């Protein structure tokens, strides 16, 4: 355009206009991914602190686009009302209280599961951007080994999504909208290209020629 010089690749997050621009130039220029509104899922067992869970859910709702997705998957049914009470209490003095309430009304889903195996199934289907495992230490390995579709796993009661976003170290440009089923977050490999190197000598060519001929005949070349 008159404003921007042509580039080979565009990376990084942005608003809906940035995403649509990246979508339209894909194929002419490379892109990393199309990260949409932020998402968090919290898997909680009976050891989880309702105050921590509430804080994690509220922190997600504070992102500000109005389209955030918040998922709570819990094994202890007695905790749900306590978590609700914690949410109500913690948002009282927040400046974005009305927006947070709207997001909880439109973008919050809580699911009670009978065990952690069911929690794994839910997580692998939703494929959330951030997945907090607020469970006993001895349950972390099972979840970590069996959940295959999450942009980032935050392990244990003290690994808040905000830490992953700001200071933990790994990229927080992560796939959303279930796209972690087939993609990963922005990483150093996104700034590299790979070229295949092929070299035969006379002897290796002779060994391979018959196989190459068979493929050629199969394709009627």
For each predicted feature, which ranges?
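Conserved NAD(P)+-binding/catalytic subdomain of aldehyde/semialdehyde dehydrogenases
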Residues: 1-56, 63-69
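Structural motif
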Residues: 8-11, 15-17, 32, 39-42, ...
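Glycine-rich beta-alpha junction loops
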Residues: 15-17, 46-48, 61-64, 74-79, ...
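Generic structural signal for well-ordered, non-membrane alpha-helical segments
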Residues: 18, 46, 50, 76-83, ...
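Glycine/threonine-rich helix-loop capping motifs at alpha-helix boundaries
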Residues: 21-36, 58-71, 75-102, 150-153, ...
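A glycine- and small/hydrophobic-rich beta-loop-beta segment
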Residues: 72-150
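C-terminal core of ALDH-fold dehydrogenases
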Residues: 126-221
């Amino acid at each position: 355009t008159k404003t921007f010089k042509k580039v080979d690749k565009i990376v990084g997050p942005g608003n809906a206009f940035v995403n649509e621009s990246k979508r339209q130039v894909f194929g002419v220029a490379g892109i990393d991914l199309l990260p949409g509104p932020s998402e968090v899922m919290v898997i909680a067992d009976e050891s989880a602190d309702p105050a921590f869970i509430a804080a994690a859910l509220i922190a997600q709702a504070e992102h500000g686009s109005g389209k955030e997705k918040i998922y709570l998957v819990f094994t202890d049914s007695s905790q749900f009302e306590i978590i609700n009470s914690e949410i109500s209490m913690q948002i009282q003095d927040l400046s974005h209280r009305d927006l947070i309430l709207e997001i909880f009304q439109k973008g919050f889903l809580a699911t009670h599961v009978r065990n952690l195996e069911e929690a794994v199934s839910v997580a692998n289907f939703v494929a959330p951007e951030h997945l907090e495992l607020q469970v006993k230490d001895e349950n972390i390995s099972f979840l970590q080994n069996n959940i295959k579709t999450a942009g980032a796993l935050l392990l244990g009661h003290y690994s808040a999504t905000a830490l992953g976003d700001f200071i933990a170290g790994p990229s927080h440009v992560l796939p959303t909208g279930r796209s972690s089923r087939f993609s990963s977050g922005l990483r150093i490999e996104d700034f590299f290209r790979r070229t295949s190197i092929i070299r035969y000598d006379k002897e290796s060519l002779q060994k391979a020629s018959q196989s190459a001929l068979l493929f050629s005949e199969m394709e009627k070349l």
